[in-house]
Each structure stands twice: as structure tokens, then as C-alpha cells.
Amino acid sequence: MNKKALIGNALLLLTAIIWGTAFAAQRVGMDHIEPFPFGASRYVLATLVLIPIIKFFEAKEKKDPGYIPPTAEEAAVQRKYTIRGGITCGMALFVASSFQQIGIQYTSAGKTAFITALYIVLVPVFGLFLKKKVTWLTWVGVAISAVGLYLLCIKEDFTIEMGDFIVFLCSICFAIHILCCDHFTEKANPVKLSCIQFATACVLSWIAAFATETITIEGIMAAGFAIFYCGVFSAGVGYTLQMVAQKDTDPTIASLLMSLESVFGAVGGYFILHETMATKELIGCVVMFAAIIVAQIPLPEKK
């Protein structure tokens, strides 16, 4: 493994740690503020953080000796896909993150991390509706994840906690969000699209907050560190590290490293929030993580 790949892997591991521990920050934030104001405040910061990052990448791109400016037609197409994609992805992100933020109030950060990570298994399955191919290993991953979800969430009387169910809805919405991003990013500017999607999620969160919840400056200040961590580190820093690192990392290794987000979510819940899980739930976490890994294993191409 060369030095660039090693650095890339280390940065992706750091990204997984940041994203994973953000679940604990989200849970802490719910002690002081309601879900929609938390999301709105978080996405304000995320949007602001990405603006200088956009400027940085634009300047870096133009300094590249091989840089060829886009034609007026190419720029118009990219702008259209960036704006449309940002708004569409932002709407999906708003719904997904809102379900997550509401659900985490009623369950643990660790369980939220693992249930949310199911989107990795669901994305290729939902891709069937877009005529994308699904490997047999993906279906194995789906079957294993169903067993893991049962062990993690289903109680002895075959009921499921409200928080776990809401977070499961969040994982479905994140899978849809990923497919939306995949559809638009090929022809859009990915950093600008991300900034617009954060801004869209921010506006929708503020509308929902003013319409349904109580907003207080005291609550926002009390949840300040959690909001700052999720907005600046999880969104701004995490997204930037992912972009930089994936250029020098094998895609399979990259996806596996980022899957560790769920593990660090559980670790963060244990050390930061002192959360514990029953043996059955821990086994469920292990089984679900195995499903996530299996679903991402690439099959050799047929000759």
C-alpha cells in the first residue's frame, strides 16, 4: 500500500469516528432542545462551513495545469443539476435526518447508529426500481440484516420500541437520499450540491420548528456544543475529509472503512453516554455489521 492510500485510509477512519461519535452528540442535544430546532441550527453551520470549502476547491481546481474551463453549455448543465440536485437531496436529507433526530430521543445512540447503517444494505435493493443490478451477495446481506434487526430491536413479545421503528424509517429515507445524490452528482458540482442540500434541509427544518415546536435561545445555547459538533465536524469536516481521502483509496476499502461509523456510534454511546446493551442486542449489532460488510463485497467480473 502506497503512502497516499495509507493517508487516505487514515482520513476515512477519522471520518467514521467523527460521524459515529456525532450520534452521541445528537443524543446529548436532545436533553436541551427539540429535534427540528436542532436540525435547523446544525444545518445553518453545515451550510456556512461548506462555503469557504467550495472557494478552496474552486481555486485548487483552477491552479491544476490540466484544468480546462467548461463551455457555456457545460456550465449551464452543471448549474441546473447542482441546483435541482441540491434541493431534491436536501428534501430527502431533511426527512431522513428528522426521523433520526426524533427517533434518537427514544432509543440509544448505539442502536441508532446500527439501524441507520442499514441504508447501506437498502440502497442496492431500492436501486432495482432504477434498473440497477443487485448481486446475490446483496440479498445475503439483506437476509442477515433482517436477523440482526430482529435481535437488536424486536422484544420478546414481538413488539418494537417506537424509537427503533422511527430510526428504521430514517434508514429507508437515507437510502432514498443516497440514490438521489447518485442520480445528480455525475453532472453536478458535488460540493456545491452538498451546500445547497444543507441549506434546503436548514430552511425546511426552520419551517417545521416554527410550525410544531418551541424554540428558545436558552435551549440552543445549552445544546451549543452538540450543534457545533454535528454541524461543523460531522457535516463540514467529515464531508471534506471523505472527498479528499476517497481520491486515493480503493472504493471497496473506502466503503468498508466508512461502515465503521456504526461501530464508533456504539462505542461513543458507551463511553460518552454510558449506554449499555443486552447480550441479544449486542449480538444483533454484530450480525447487522456483518450484513453491511457482506452487502459491499464486490464480486469478480465475469470474463
Report residues per predicted region.
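C-terminal-most transmembrane helix of multi-pass membrane proteins
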Residues: 43, 51-59, 67-69, 223-225, ...
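Transmembrane alpha-helical segments that form core, pore/gating elements
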Residues: 36, 46-50, 123-124, 159-213, ...
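Hydrophobic transmembrane alpha-helices of multi-pass small-molecule transport proteins
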Residues: 50, 134-154, 174, 205, ...
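Glycine-/small-residue-enriched transmembrane alpha-helix faces in small-molecule transporters
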Residues: 1-40, 90-91, 95, 99-102, ...
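Specific transmembrane alpha-helical segments of multi-pass solute transporters/efflux pumps
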Residues: 22-23, 54-116, 151, 231-249
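Hydrophobic/small/kink-forming positions within alpha-helical transmembrane segments
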Residues: 20, 24, 90, 94, ...
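Helix-helix packing/entry segments at the starts of transmembrane helices
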Residues: 39-41, 112-118, 181-202, 235-271
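Juxtamembrane helix-entry segments on the extracytoplasmic side of multipass membrane proteins
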Residues: 4-9, 32-40, 78-82, 139, ...
